[in-house]
Amino acid sequence: MKFSPLVDELIQSLKCLPGVGPKSAQRMAFQLLERDRKAGQTLAQALASAMSDVGHCRSCRTFTEESHCPICASNKRGQSEQICVVETPADVLAIEAGGHFSGRYFVLLGHLSPLDGVGPEELGLSLLEEHLCSGGVSELILATNPTVEGDATAHFIADMAKVHNVSVSRIAHGVPVGGELEYVDSTTLALSFNGRLPI
């Protein structure tokens, strides 16, 4: 059976979300149309507003409605000499939730992936280099994902920072707190052993 063009368009549009296949998109569309049209209208308005009004911070590239995000606009944090480099704005939220970092961020919006056409320019590394040249950065903390692409990106940025005599560190990877060793993969265990600390 074929749906009306508008229903079909809604279902197809919902499939653009990560992890949403045809069945999930259909369930979402039917939920909004059958049971919660007001929520659907609120969702549509919020989505339209976000798509037109949310851009990227001119300094760190995270999402913001202003020219600078609240962290970069902050008198205290905006002047920090530590910059944590992450792949996505979601990574910023995860680190902020921990409350252990009080410096600035730089959001790559991805990682190096030559096969996908993602090089240094697509990651905004020229802007990061401007920060490094300014003399206001003493340390880069690399918090890219522990993947082949994330590691390659971290090495590329580390080489860039060393040219400017900026200290570079990488967040530790290993066994999660509360995790059981029998469920940890061998690569993570190897990282844990190699990164062990004295007590």
From Swiss-Prot:
Coiled coil: none annotated. PROSITE patterns: TOPRIM. Residues 81-176 form the Toprim domain. Keywords: DNA damage, DNA recombination, DNA repair, Metal-binding, Zinc, Zinc-finger. It holds the Pfam family Toprim_4. One of its GO terms (biological process) is DNA repair. PANTHER family: RECOMBINATION PROTEIN RECR. HAMAP family: RecR. May play a role in DNA repair. It seems to be involved in an RecBC-independent recombinational process of DNA repair. It may act with RecF and RecO. This is Recombination protein RecR.
